[in-house]
Amino acid sequence: MTTLGTPATLLAALLSVAIVAVAAPLKTDLAKSTVAAQFKQMNVPVEAKFRRFQAQIDYDAAKPEASKATVEIDTASLDVGEAEMNREVAKKEWFNAAQYPKATFVSSSIKPAGGGKLTVAGKLSIKGKSSDVSFPMTVKTDGGKQVFEGALPIRRLAYNIGEGEWKDTSIVADEVIIKFRVIAGQ
């Protein structure tokens, strides 16, 4: 006859399964998630969207400091709203998508900042250049899923985005804001 053990053993086993389930990576709903780049071109605001990206998020609301995130963006997928410009930004002077097909962010820390806000730090790598970054992010639950939103300002020239004649910041501003809204659940 097989026994399940004492009630305390059974409870401990069930709790450990529940804890593992909470700590499992969330499944990103890519159809409802967005990553965009906002910048100014000739002082006119532009918002372009990355059409292909992956986000792996291990998030535990009870222990946010144990959370991790990794994001990979297909640099050739930037859609600025015009096919010719989309091809242009994939070229060597901009993202050089042939040599650097992915931009990545890997978190090194996620800290609670109160009121549904987190401070996220990590390494951002674009076009062979990496730097440590930190930015605020909000997290809320909506329809049983986690919604992560934030904005990360960067300087495009620090990553060699816009080489040669495109270094001129009077045409395309140096400041770019990477905005994201990622929806994920179990």
Can you say where each PLM-predicted feature lies in the sequence?
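N-terminal secretory signal peptides that target proteins for export/translocation
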Residues: 1-6
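Low-complexity, acidic/polar, glycine-enriched regions of mature
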Residues: 21-186
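Bacterial N-terminal signal peptides
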Residues: 7-18
